[in-house]
Amino acid sequence: MPDQHEADGVFVKVCGITSEADALLAVGMGAAAVGFIFAPSPRQMAPAAVADIVKRLPHETVTVGVFRDESPRRVIEIANQIGLRAVQLHGVESVEDTRWIASRVNWTIKAFPAGHRNIQRFAEYGAQSLLIDGANPGSGELFDWRLAEGVVDPSRLIVSGGLRPDNVSGAIAHLHPWGVDVASGVESAPGVKDPTKLREFMAAVRTAERAANRAGRREAAPSIQPDDGRHSTTDADRRAPTSGPDLFDWQDEP
C-alpha cells in the first residue's frame, strides 16, 4: 500500500483526473489521492498520458488507477508502467480476479454498487478498502446512504456516488467513512475540475471531520505500508482467473 497517509482527517480522493493542472489543483487543495480512469468513459485516460502526469506530482500523492473488467495481467502491467500506488476495481471482477490482483499491488480498492449482495462477501476479495458507489458510476446520482450502514468496518470504507459540496458533510456524519471519493461533483464538465466546487468540497469535508472529531466518531486509518514492489510483471505471468457476474450499469455515465 502507499506511504502512510496521516489520518487526522477524512481521506479524500478526487477521481476522473484528465490533466496535470487538475491533478495539481486537487493535491494543492488537500486531496490525498487522485484517480485516473482507464475504462471507457468521458474521463478515460491513456496510460502514457497518466504516466506523464504522475511523474510531476508530489511524492506523497496517492495515485489510483481505476479499472473495469480489465485483464488482471493488464492491470498489473499498467500499474507497473505508470508507478501507480493503488488500484481500484470498479467492474464485475470476481473474488478470484480481485485476490489475484490484490496479491500483486500494495493497495487494492474494490467497488460495489450500494445494496449489492456481494458487499457481504467483501472480506473474501482480499482488498484493503471497500468503495460503495451508486449504480451508475460517474452519473452524479446519489444513493441511499442507509444501504451502506454497517456493511464493513468504517476504517475500510470509502463512500462515492453523487457527492457534492452541499451533501458530503451529510455522508460523513451518517456513515463515518475513512474516505470519500468525488468526480462529477466537483466538475464544470466531464473530466474538467472546477476550482470553486473543489474548494467548497474540501471545506465541507474538513468541517464535517471536525464535527466528527468533537463527537469522537473518527475511525482509525487502515495501516498503509510503503511500496514493497509487489506489483511486479514477473508475478503477473502466473495464470489469472476470469471474471464474475455483472454489477454496475455504466450506460448512463455522462
Where are each of the predicted segments found?
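Conserved N-terminal beta1-alpha1 strand-loop-helix module at the mouth
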Residues: 1-254
